[in-house]
Structure formats: structure tokens, C-alpha cells
């Protein structure tokens, strides 16, 4: 589709308007380029034998709009011979060879690859296909947007053919594990009418070389397959197609029964086979280039072939065969496990499930099936070993499943740059058959000579202008695309490209955000879960705040087996679940032995006393205490680092990021204290540094003089400072808590830890004597993206801080809380800190 001049103009205006995150890394902010600089750049864009509606047409429009915004130069678009001077030539490899007679100078190109040669005013962008040419155009614009006008001449091709993103969007417009607003695809059971945001999403994805999008939740609703909704899918596909992106959909295994009325969904039943073939034909009639299907079956209550005693391979192949006439791919998730297993049986282990279910099926899947394997054996934890399934399938296509949306990792309200986590997994050598077997080479198909393979990431963008709910979280989407294309790229290098494109080329900005981001995963691991114990979040509720007790005493299998004396899963072959033995011999030997197991996976593979000494010399329990304090201190440092950038970043994005970092600093303390108090209480072993349970700068709310407030026993107990909070005596009673301050006179940062529950917007006012020093409203459901909580717990716990408060010894501190809805203006404690002290 050809963009009108007005459309291009409006788009350019949008780029120069408010910096709200909508443009992501495609801001194309102006860089310094005087008239001499402009004369040295191309004057036109030449396309060879292409239509306006394809990716090359899109490339020409992107180049035209991008160069005008970046360097202020207007380029015409024309179709002519390859000999045009002062031009950007955009073509496929075949077009270039036919039109230019220069076959000898063209390098070889692999999957979706491109050749970019730029010498001043002469630029050649040649793609292995139209998609590759579009990627080359985005690459050239990325260089210019970062101020790089140097001569370049290189080729690059995709690491793997499949580079998809998954959206867990529901038909009602909600998004499972989405933290950035409603779906851009669905509402009220149908496809939305306005797909303008989908177009911008397509631009962002194409610029990082994503070639497929699964648009709906893996916990799929069969109503997506109605005629009306299939027509809607065609509209979505029409938006993505000019950007070289194919759409696919998730399927509900039981659809032949629930939607088709067959009374069965047995994958070997002829009527079921016919039903899926007909549905697939109908979809391809509407979307001829549909990428294929994604299926979650026999997992977490989702229907599957086990209902009829059929194998998972038989279940997958019914879809694969329906897709084969159309060239479609089936992505079949290996996230299959029993969530009712008995913890009292020492050898039970959810981590064994993927190999147990799929190893014996190797070679039984159709050639267009790719098994989509989560990076670890459990579920997107802050640290897991690589899934052993990658080492157990020789004759089956594989893809790695990552998660851009931060389900267990702070839900975009905590800064966590994920590329270093992913790189550690991708670079891991599984040593299959004692041969080099890097995970990245397994999923590409290279290691086992498979033709299909690749990448999937659960992204879950929403209608929030930042796409993911947080400006800084977009670094993870950018990094995913870069790694899916070239997994040998450096995490810091990827990050710095993103920073320059997103925030500009100010060196202070670059250095500061680099330092913050590269420290963020270790910090989050430190204050949420160490030594391979998993993310100690509430696995039964929000997957957000701390609740280590929720890991155990249930059938979900994310156990820690912590008791008074010991902690950790014994996954050895000798004494435990045998999970270590699922790895190839060289790796199994490392994990089987307590001494050779890396400290950061110790509690994943071994059950040890709290007093066990790590390679560092610390005991397990002291490492827990120290790491949680270190992590929280790092989160507080992020705040001061960001504040140093004031005036260097536009005000809107500066303030929005600042708000999240203020919250993260406070919530990291909730995490720190909850985990430390939990294990101190369980083990009875004190912190050698006497920090845990000792907070001399705090005043507990329940110790204050209360009027209209009453003490409340918090559950989990560890999510309140002294295991208690105060709440108003009724939802219509204003509460007052006051105390005489016994601190030396001076200037303090006054913090209040409270609970911001879903279902109410309480108001609080803090007084020193009769002077108001702070007021706020509990409205985090409007300002933050994490899954809210209706309880007083570690999800709703938070802190607000008022800086530079003058205090005299003996001053009267008073907090007045006005409840609202179900929220009884809950308070935990007040803290008065000298500047730069973290309590």
C-alpha cells in the first residue's frame, strides 16, 4: 500500500511530538547534518520491479520518511535502472542480478539475509528476498539514527528461519501475563476495528527482523475460528504483510468438540482430522501466507490427546498434516507437566517432565513440527539451568521459548534487562555425545542437521503508549530480535544501540543506562531468589511479590523443600529425582557432584544445610542475607543514577521512568525483608551482620498511638516489618497513627511503607507537628502495570519517601489515613533515614 504524502507528513509530525514511547527505537530523532553532509547522502530511492504493497515498497517509504527526519533531506522514490547515481538502491538478490548484470560482486546470502553497501551518496540494499531488503533498509536507518555515516559493506543472514513472537491475548481484550493495557488485536470476542497500533507494532517487529506473530493466547478460545473472526484475522494479516511478517494463531485442542459439535476431539478420529483440514483450508483462503499454528495441549488443564490415550506426537501431527499443503508450521509447546504431583514423594520432580514426555517421541513428529521448549525446566525463573530436553531430541525440530514480558521478573515495574540471562543460556554447551552443542546451535537446527528451528518469545504488548508498560523494558524486546537474528551479538552492544536509538547519543545517558541495565538482572536475582532456589514469588497468585512458602506444599512442583535445617531440591541420580541424569554425561557429572555444581545452581540440584559453605566461603543462609541487602542497595542506586540524567532526557519519559524506579527501590526492600525474615524465622540462624530483623530507623505503625486504626496480622507474616500492619476499624472510618519521634535533630528522608490494594484508593497525609510534609493516594492500579492484589501482602506492599524533612527530637509525627472501597488505608511502618542511608 502506497503512503500518501499527507500520511508520511503526519507520521513525521508524530515522531517530533511528545516522547511517550510509541515510536520505541524508531524515533529517528534528528542528528547533526549540515548542507555539506546532506549533499554527500543519496538524493533518491530506486526500487527494481517491486510493488508498493510489498516489503520493498515499505522499505522505500521507511527510507524516505526516516532520512527526512534524521538528516532533513527529502528523497524521491522512483523505479529505474540500477545505474542511478546518488541513490539508495533497494532490491532482492534476484532482481539485482537480472537488472544489473553484476552477479560476480554479489555476496552469498542466507535466510532472509541482506547485503548493505553504503559509500557516501551511493547505497545498495540487496535482500535474499523482499523481507531481507526491508531488514537492510532498517539497518541503514539505524546506522544513520546513531550518527554513523561511515562507509560500510557487509552481509548478514538469519541464525534460524523461525523468529516469532507470541501474544497471550484473549478474545475479551485482556492479556494473560500482560502488564501494559488491553490487547491491540481483540475486544469483546472479536478483532478490533482500528488496527493502527498493529501497524506500528509491525514496524517495530520488522525493524528487529521478526518474521512471525502468534496473535492469541496459548490458552486458546475456539471462537477465534468463527467465520467473522477468521475474516478479522485476514485484516490483521493484511497489516503485517507489507512488513514481511506472517501471522499465526494458537488453537484449542478441543475445538472440534466445543466449536464443531463433533462430540470428540480424538486426533485419530477421521471426523476430527477432516474438521481440522477444513478449518485450515478456510484460514488459508483468507490468509494465504499464514505462518501456522501454536498449540498448548495436555497441560495446566488444557485439553490434549491424552484424553484419548493418544501420544503428544499423534496430537501434534493432526495439525501438522492439515498445514502441510499450505506450507505452514506447527509450533507445539513442550510445557507439559502434572500440576498435581505429590511433594511427599522424594523422587517426584516437575523439572523431569519435558524429557519424560517427549524424549521417547523423538522422530515421530512430522517434518513441519517444531517443539517450542521453554529455556529452563520449570517456568521462566530468574535462574534455571538450560532445559535438558534440548539435548535429548536428535530427529525433531526445536525452538527456544523466551519471555519478554516479565511474568516472574518484576512485571515491568522492576528494571530487569534480560539479554545477559538469555545469552548465558544460549551460549551454554550441552556437550551432546561429547561434541560441541551450544544451545543456540541446537535451536537453529545446525547441531543435529535440522531444516527448521528457531525462536519464540512471549511479548504481550498492550495499548499502553510504551508498548510494554515501561520505557526501559523495551530494551528486552529489541534485544530479543537482535539475538534471534544473531545470538553471538554482545548484550552490552545490543543495549547501547537501543539506548542511542531510544534516548539519543549523550554519553552520560549512554553510560548511565548501560550501567543500570547491566546490573539489573543480578540485582533482581539477589533480592528475589538466590543459588538456584527459583524466584521466591507467590506462584499461586500473582507471580509478582514475595511469598516463599507458596513454593511448597502443593502440586505445582516448584518446590524448595525448605525446613528448619535444610533447603534445596535434590536432583541428583544418586539420592534425588534424577534430573541431573537427564543431561549429557559431561554436564550430568558436574551437576551430580555437590562440589562441582556452580554456586548459582546449588539449590536447584542439591538439598543442603543452611550452614553449607559455598565456594565463596559463605554459608548458604548468610549468602541469602547478604545478597538480598546487596540487591536492594543496587535498586536504590538505580534511582540516584537516573536522577543524574535530569535535563538530558525529555521530561515525560524522564518522569515516567523515575516513577517506576522510585517504586522499584521501595519494593526491593519489601522483597529483601520478606525473604530474609522468612528464612531467619525458619532456620533460626541470625544474620552475622545483625541487619535482619533489626531496623533502628523504623517506627512500627502498630506501636504508635492509634485512633480509628487497629493492628492487623499480615499474611504472609514476612511481608510486614514486624509481622503486623494497621488498618482502619471500618471502611468509613478515618484512621490516625501518631508518635513522638526520638531521633536526633536533623534532616531525614521520611519513608512510609504501606499497602496499595486493588479495589480502593485510600488517601494518606503525613504531619510533623502541624506541618504537612506529604500527601498521596493509593492509586498504583493506574500508575503501575503489575498484577494487582486485593490483599495486604507482598504484592501490595510499597513505600513512599519524602526527602529532606527537618526533624527535631521530640517532634510529633502523625499519619492520617482515609480508606476507600475495600482498602482500609493500611500502614506498615515509618522510617526516618539520614540522607543516602538504605535501612
UniProtKB/Swiss-Prot annotation:
<dbReference type="Pfam" id="PF07477">
    <property type="entry name" value="Glyco_hydro_67C"/>
</dbReference>
<feature type="glycosylation site" description="N-linked (GlcNAc...) asparagine">
    <location>
        <position position="342"/>
    </location>
</feature>
<dbReference type="InterPro" id="IPR011395">
    <property type="entry name" value="Glyco_hydro_67_aGlcAse"/>
</dbReference>
<keyword id="KW-0732">Signal</keyword>
<feature type="glycosylation site" description="N-linked (GlcNAc...) asparagine">
    <location>
        <position position="49"/>
    </location>
</feature>
<dbReference type="InterPro" id="IPR017853">
    <property type="entry name" value="Glycoside_hydrolase_SF"/>
</dbReference>
<dbReference type="InterPro" id="IPR029018">
    <property type="entry name" value="Hex-like_dom2"/>
</dbReference>
<feature type="glycosylation site" description="N-linked (GlcNAc...) asparagine">
    <location>
        <position position="221"/>
    </location>
</feature>
<feature type="glycosylation site" description="N-linked (GlcNAc...) asparagine">
    <location>
        <position position="575"/>
    </location>
</feature>
<dbReference type="InterPro" id="IPR011100">
    <property type="entry name" value="Glyco_hydro_67_cat"/>
</dbReference>
<dbReference type="Pfam" id="PF03648">
    <property type="entry name" value="Glyco_hydro_67N"/>
</dbReference>
<dbReference type="InterPro" id="IPR005154">
    <property type="entry name" value="Glyco_hydro_67_aGlcAse_N"/>
</dbReference>
<keyword id="KW-0378">Hydrolase</keyword>
<keyword id="KW-0119">Carbohydrate metabolism</keyword>
<dbReference type="GO" id="GO:0045493">
    <property type="term" value="P:xylan catabolic process"/>
</dbReference>
<dbReference type="InterPro" id="IPR037054">
    <property type="entry name" value="A-glucoronidase_C_sf"/>
</dbReference>
<dbReference type="GO" id="GO:0046559">
    <property type="term" value="F:alpha-glucuronidase activity"/>
</dbReference>
<comment type="function">
    <text>Alpha-glucuronidase involved in the hydrolysis of xylan, a major structural heterogeneous polysaccharide found in plant biomass representing the second most abundant polysaccharide in the biosphere, after cellulose. Releases 4-O-methylglucuronic acid from xylan.</text>
</comment>
<feature type="glycosylation site" description="N-linked (GlcNAc...) asparagine">
    <location>
        <position position="101"/>
    </location>
</feature>
<protein>
    <recommendedName>
        <fullName>Probable alpha-glucuronidase A</fullName>
        <ecNumber>3.2.1.139</ecNumber>
    </recommendedName>
</protein>
<keyword id="KW-0326">Glycosidase</keyword>
<feature type="glycosylation site" description="N-linked (GlcNAc...) asparagine">
    <location>
        <position position="464"/>
    </location>
</feature>
<comment type="similarity">
    <text>Belongs to the glycosyl hydrolase 67 family.</text>
</comment>
<dbReference type="GO" id="GO:0005576">
    <property type="term" value="C:extracellular region"/>
</dbReference>
<feature type="glycosylation site" description="N-linked (GlcNAc...) asparagine">
    <location>
        <position position="309"/>
    </location>
</feature>
<feature type="glycosylation site" description="N-linked (GlcNAc...) asparagine">
    <location>
        <position position="526"/>
    </location>
</feature>
<dbReference type="Pfam" id="PF07488">
    <property type="entry name" value="Glyco_hydro_67M"/>
</dbReference>
<keyword id="KW-0624">Polysaccharide degradation</keyword>
<dbReference type="InterPro" id="IPR011099">
    <property type="entry name" value="Glyco_hydro_67_C"/>
</dbReference>
<keyword id="KW-0325">Glycoprotein</keyword>
<keyword id="KW-0964">Secreted</keyword>
<feature type="glycosylation site" description="N-linked (GlcNAc...) asparagine">
    <location>
        <position position="731"/>
    </location>
</feature>
<keyword id="KW-0858">Xylan degradation</keyword>
<feature type="glycosylation site" description="N-linked (GlcNAc...) asparagine">
    <location>
        <position position="148"/>
    </location>
</feature>
<feature type="glycosylation site" description="N-linked (GlcNAc...) asparagine">
    <location>
        <position position="681"/>
    </location>
</feature>
<feature type="signal peptide">
    <location>
        <begin position="1"/>
        <end position="18"/>
    </location>
</feature>
<feature type="glycosylation site" description="N-linked (GlcNAc...) asparagine">
    <location>
        <position position="278"/>
    </location>
</feature>
Amino acid at each position: 500500500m502506497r503512503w500518501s504524502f499527507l500520511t508520511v507528513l503526519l507520521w513525521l509530525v508524530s515522531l517530533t511530538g511528545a516522547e511517550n514511547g510509541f515510536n520505541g527505537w524508531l524515533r529517528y530523532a534528528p542528528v547533526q547534518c549540515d548542507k555539506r553532509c546532506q549533499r554527500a547522502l543519496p538524493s533518491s530511492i530506486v526500487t527494481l520491479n517491486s510493488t508498493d504493497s510489498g516489503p520493498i515498497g515499505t522499505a522505500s517509504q521507511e527510507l524516505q520518511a526516516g532520512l527526512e527526519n534524521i538528516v532533513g533531506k527529502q528523497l524521491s522514490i522512483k523505479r529505474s535502472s540500477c545505474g542511478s547515481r546518488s541513490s539508495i538502491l533497494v532490491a532482492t538478490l534476484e532482481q539485482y542480478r537480472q537488472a544489473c548484470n553484476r552477479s560476480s560482486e554479489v555476496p552469498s546470502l542466507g535466510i532472509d539475509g541482506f547485503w548493505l553497501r553504503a559509500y557516501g551518496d551511493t547505497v545498495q540494499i540487496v535482500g535474499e528476498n523482499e523481507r531481507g531488503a526491508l531488514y537492510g533498509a532498517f539497518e541503514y536507518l539505524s546506522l544513520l539514527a546513531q550518527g554513523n555515516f561511515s562507509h560500510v559493506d557487509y552481509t548478514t543472514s538469519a541464525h534460524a528461519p523461525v523468529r516469532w513472537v507470541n501474544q497471550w491475548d484473549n478474545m475479551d481484550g485482556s492479556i494473560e501475563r500482560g502488564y501494559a493495557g488491553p490487547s491491540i488485536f481483540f475486544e469483546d470476542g472479536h478483532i478490533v476495528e482500528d488496527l493502527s497500533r498493529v501497524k506500528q507494532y509491525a514496524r517495530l517487529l520488522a525493524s528487529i527482523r521478526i518474521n512471525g506473530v502468534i496473535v492469541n493466547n496459548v490458552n486458546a478460545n475456539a471462537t477465534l475460528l468463527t467465520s467473522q473472526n477468521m475474516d478479522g484475522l485476514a485484516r490483521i494479516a493484511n497489516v503485517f504483510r507489507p512488513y514481511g511478517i506472517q501471522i499465526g494463531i494458537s488453537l484449542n485442542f478441543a475445538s472440534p468438540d466445543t466449536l464443531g459439535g463433533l462430540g470428540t476431539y480424538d486426533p485419530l478420529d477421521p471426523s476430527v482430522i477432516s474438521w481440522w483440514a477444513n478449518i485450515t483450508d478456510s484460514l488459508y483462503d483468507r490468509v494465504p501466507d499464514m505462518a501456522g499454528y501454536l498449540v498448548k495441549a495436555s497441560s495446566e488443564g488444557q485439553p490434549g490427546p491424552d484424553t484419548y490415550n493418544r501420544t503428544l506426537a499423534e496430537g501434534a501431527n493432526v495439525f501438522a498434516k492439515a498445514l502441510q499443503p499450505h506450507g505452514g508450521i506447527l509450533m507445539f509447546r513442550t510445557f507439559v507437566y502434572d500440576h498435581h504431583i505429590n511433594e511427599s514423594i522424594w523422587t517426584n520432580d516437575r523439572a523431569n517432565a519435558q524429557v519424560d514426555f517427549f524424549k521417547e517421541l523423538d522422530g515421530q513428529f512430522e517434518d513441519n513440527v517444531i517443539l517450542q521448549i521453554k529455556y529452563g525446566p520449570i517456568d521462566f525463573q530468574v535462574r534455571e539451568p538450560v532445559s535438558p530436553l534440548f539435548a535429548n531430541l536428535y530427529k525433531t525440530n526445536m525452538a527456544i521459548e523466551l519471555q519478554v514480558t516479565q511474568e516472574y521478573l518484576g512485571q515491568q515495574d522492576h528494571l530487569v534487562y534480560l539479554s545477559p540471562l538469555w545469552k548465558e543460556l544460549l551460549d551454554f554447551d550441552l556437550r551432546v555425545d561429547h561434541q560441541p552443542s551450544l544451545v543456540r546451535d541446537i535451536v537453529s537446527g545446525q547441531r543435529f542437521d535440522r531444516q527448521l528451528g528457531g525462536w519464540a518469545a512471549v511479548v504481550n504488548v498492550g495499548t499502553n503508549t510504551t508498548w510494554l508498560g515501561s520505557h526501559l523494558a523495551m530494551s528486552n524486546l529489541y534485544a530479543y530480535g537482535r539475538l534471534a537474528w544473531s545470538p553471538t551479538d554482545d548484550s552490552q552492544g545490543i543495549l547501547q544501540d537501543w539506548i542511542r536509538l531510544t534516548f539519543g547519543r549523550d554519553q552520560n545517558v549512554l553510560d548511565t543506562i548501560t550501567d543500570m541495565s547491566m546490573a539489573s538482572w543480578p540485582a533482581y536475582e539477589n533480592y528475589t531468589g538466590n543459588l538456584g532456589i527459583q524466584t521466591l514469588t507467590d506462584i499461586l497468585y500473582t507471580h509478582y511479590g514475595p511469598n516463599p512458602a507458596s513454593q511448597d506444599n502443593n502440586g505445582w512442583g516448584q518446590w524448595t523443600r525448605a525446613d528448619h535445617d535444610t533447603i534445596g531440591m535434590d536432583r541428583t541420580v544418586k539420592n534425588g529425582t534424577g534430573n541431573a541424569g537427564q543431561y549429557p554425561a559431561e554436564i550430568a557429572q558436574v551437576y551430580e557432584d555437590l562440589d562441582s555444581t556452580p554456586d548459582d545452581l546449588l539449590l536447584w540440584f542439591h538439598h543442603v544445610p543452611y550452614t553449607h559453605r559455598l565456594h565463596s566461603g559463605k554459608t548458604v543462609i548468610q549468602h541469602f542475607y547478604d545478597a538480598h541487602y546487596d540487591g536492594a542497595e543496587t535498586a536504590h542506586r538505580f534511582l540516584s543514577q537516573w536522577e543524574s540524567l535530569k535535563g538530558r532526557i525529555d521530561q515525560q519519559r524522564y518522569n515516567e521512568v523515575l516513577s517506576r524506579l522510585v517504586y522499584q527501590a521501595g519494593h526491593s526492600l519489601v522483597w529483601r525483608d520478606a525473604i530474609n525474615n522468612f528464612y531467619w524465622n525458619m532456620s533460626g540462624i541470625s544474620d552475622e551482620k545483625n541487619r535482619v530483623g533489626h531496623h533502628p530507623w523504623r517506627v512500627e505503625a502498630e506501636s504508635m498511638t492509634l485512633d480509628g486504626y487497629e493492628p492487623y496480622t499480615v499474611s504472609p507474616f514476612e511481608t510486614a516489618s514486624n509481622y503486623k500492619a494497621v488498618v482502619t476499624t471500618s471502611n468509613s472510618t478515618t484512621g490516625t497513627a501518631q508518635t513522638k519521634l526520638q531521633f536526633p535533630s536533623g534532616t531525614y528522608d521520611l519513608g512510609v511503607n504501606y499497602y496499595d490494594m486493588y479495589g480502593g484508593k485510600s488517601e494518606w497525609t503525613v504531619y510533623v507537628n502541624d506541618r504537612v510534609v506529604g500527601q498521596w493516594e493509593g492509586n498504583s492500579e493506574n500508575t503501575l502495570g503489575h498484577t494487582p492484589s486485593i490483599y495486604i501482602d507482598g504484592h501490595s506492599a510499597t513505600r513512599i519517601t519524602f526527602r529532606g524533612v527537618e526533624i527535631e527530637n521530640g517532634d510529633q509525627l502523625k499519619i492520617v489515613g482515609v480508606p476507600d472501597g475495600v482498602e482500609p488505608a493500611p500502614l506498615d511502618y515509618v522510617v526516618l533515614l539520614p540522607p543516602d542511608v538504605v535501612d
